[in-house]
Structures are given as C-alpha cells and as structure tokens.
A protein has these predicted regions:
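Conserved RecA-like P-loop NTPase ATPase core
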Residues: 9, 64, 129, 193, ...
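Post-Walker A helix-loop "phosphate-sensing" segment adjacent to the P-loop in P-loop NTPases
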Residues: 35-50
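Phosphate-binding/switch region of NTP-binding enzymes
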Residues: 16-17, 22, 26-27, 125, ...
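Pre-Walker A adenine-sensing motif
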Residues: 1-9
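Conserved inter-motif catalytic segment of the P-loop NTP-binding fold
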Residues: 21, 47-143, 147, 154, ...
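Hydrophobic positions on the alpha1 helix immediately C-terminal to the Walker A/P-loop
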Residues: 28, 32
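C-terminal regions of RecA-like/P-loop NTPase motor modules
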Residues: 119-120, 158, 202-321
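Pre-Walker A (Motif I) flank of P-loop NTPase domains
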Residues: 11-15, 60
Length: 321
C-alpha cells in the first residue's frame, strides 16, 4: 500500500476531513496539499517545543477544487503557504475556484470530465471544498448521497488518486455516543469512505486536534497542530503554516502504551497497581482494555512479567544490555 503522507491518504482512497466552522480544516488540508506538491514533511515539530507527530510525504501533483471560500481567499492562503515553504513557482498545484456551472458529483458526466482534467495534470491528491457544494443540491441526509459517494469512489479508482472531501459535523454534537456520529449527513457518506478525521479547535486558540473516527487501513493516532501566520504592512496574509505539537491523547492504544511505560519507569508493579495507575491517567479507558494491552505488550516483549509472592504478576521494563 502506498501513502501520500506516512500512514495517511492511501492511493487510491476516499477520505473526509470534517469539523465545525472555524476549526481551520480547509487551511490545514491546504497546508498538507502544498507539502505533498513540494515533497516536504507535513507538520514539522513546532520550534518552541518537542514532541508531536510529523508526516513525511511523497512528492506528487495535486489539485484543489473550491466551491466554498472563493478565488481571492483561496489564492491568498495558498500564496501564504507557498511563501512559508519556499515552494517553487512551477510546483505541480492545480487550483479551480468557483467554476460556473459548478461541479455536480451526482452527475457521472461531470466526474468523467474531471477524470480527463486530472489525467492532464497527473494529480494524485484531489481535494473538494466542500461536500455540500459539489452534491448537485441533493439533501445530504438522503439516500441519494449513495450516488455521489459512488461517483467519488469511481474517480479515485480511475485516477489512482487520494480524494479528500472537506465536510462539516453535526450541530450541537454533545458528549457521549460514537465519535463517527458527529459526521453530518446520511449514513452512506461514512460507509463509503476509507478514512475520516475529525478536527476540533478550542475557542480563540490557534491549536487544533485531529482524531480518527473511521479507518479501513492503518490506525491513525490522535495528533495536534499549531497554526502560525503573519501579515505584511498592508495587513494582508504574508506567510502561514502548521506545526506539530504534543497531542492531547487520552484514549488511543498509543496513550495506553505510553502510560504503562510511564508507570513502570519507577520500578516493577503488580498487575492491580499497574492497571490502576494507567486508569488514573486515562479515566475514559476501561480496565479490561488496559489489561488486554498489558498482555499484548508482554507478548511483544515490550515489558516483562514475572510471578512474585503469592503468585502475583509483577511487571517491569526490559533491561537492555
């Protein structure tokens, strides 16, 4: 399997990045697109801290299809990103903005015409901003979205490209329930995609969190990014970029592994003390899941288990010579 960015965006695939308005989702994906066009690592570590997750990319032509922001703002953002990354002027980036008549992804003829355009550029990443504006006026809560998603899958298969669709989450999505339920629209939308990433943002902050809510391939652990920008003397956007920062990850398998290792740094622990220490650090993770992951780490020789007094299981970190 080939990925455009390490562990992200299989070729071919259909993917959705979604979130509430104002979560910087379009800007974040534009940042990814520019990095792929230039073959640069996406989300380099923030200069002011350590940690975070970066994604090396494979250089490929890319295409952005905008029916949301409008031409002026779209070009302004891409220019600011290109200045930050010192992207060559001949970088393989194709941008369509507010074409009229608009693309109708429910119309196979429109998709066939798009296939021809993609063929001339060789684009391996095609971004649509956004799903609602390319669906030909179809109610996104209706089963008619099945046809839209089928056509986008056909586009991916014929071109061999990764398709990224920018979409919105449901209003008033509260605590509880399955994470994927936040994805707005008919159930066929989520059913048709290979990867869904939800983007959230704390009010007034330039920090965003990205969490996988569906994956048919590799598990994507939660990651976080910081948005940076500056303006010129005229007040226009001069440069912009995202950096990786340490994620606020309290539920993934990686988080469980992290807390197990942290707990064992101070010495050996019996099973009850170990799982309780992890549970204290990760209150939303169940006891059974923690115990299962402890056993998996023992099986992979990532931690040691010996039998102590009264047949108690004692766990320690391996000692490497």
């Amino acid at each position: 399997t080939q990925y455009l960015a390490a562990g992200l965006l299989e070729l071919p695939s259909v993917n959705i990045f979604y979130g509430a308005p104002g979560t910087l989702k379009s800007f974040l994906i534009a940042d990814l697109l520019v990095c792929i066009a230039a073959g640069k690592t996406w989300l380099e570590p923030a200069p002011w801290q350590t940690g975070g997750q970066s994604f090396p990319t494979i250089k490929n032509p890319v295409m952005w299809i905008d029916f949301d922001m409008g031409r002026r703002r779209t070009i302004e953002r891409f220019a600011a990103l290109a200045r930050h990354y010192k992207t060559p002027t001949d970088a393989p980036i194709t941008i369509y903005s507010m074409s009229n008549p608009p693309l109708d992804a429910s119309n196979p003829g429109h998709i066939a015409e798009l296939v021809a355009r993609v063929a001339t550029t060789g684009a391996k990443l095609i971004v649509f901003d956004n799903l609602g504006t390319i669906s030909g006026g179809i109610d996104e809560n209706s089963s008619a979205m099945i046809g839209v998603m089928f056509n986008l899958r056909w586009l991916a298969d014929v071109t061999g490209a990764a398709i990224v669709i920018i979409h919105h989450q449901r209003k008033g999505n509260g605590i509880g329930g399955r994470a994927g339920d936040a994805l707005r629209g008919h159930s066929s939308i989520e059913a048709a995609i290979d990867l869904a990433l939800q983007i959230t943002r704390e009010p007034y902050a330039e920090l965003i969190n990205i969490e996988m809510t569906k994956s048919r391939g590799l598990e994507v652990y939660p990651f976080s990014a910081a948005f940076t920008f500056d303006h010129n003397n005229a007040g226009d956007l001069e440069t912009a970029a995202f950096y990786s920062i340490e994620p606020d990850d309290k539920q993934s398998n990686r988080a469980i592994e992290r807390e197990i290792k942290t707990a064992l740094q101070s010495g050996g622990m019996i099973q009850t003390a170990l799982w309780q220490a992890v549970k204290d650090a990760l209150p939303d993770v169940t006891k059974n899941r923690i115990l299962d992951y402890i056993k998996r780490m023992v099986a992979r020789n990532e931690i040691n288990m010996t039998v102590g007094a009264k047949n108690a299981r004692v766990y320690t970190m391996p000692v490497f010579q």
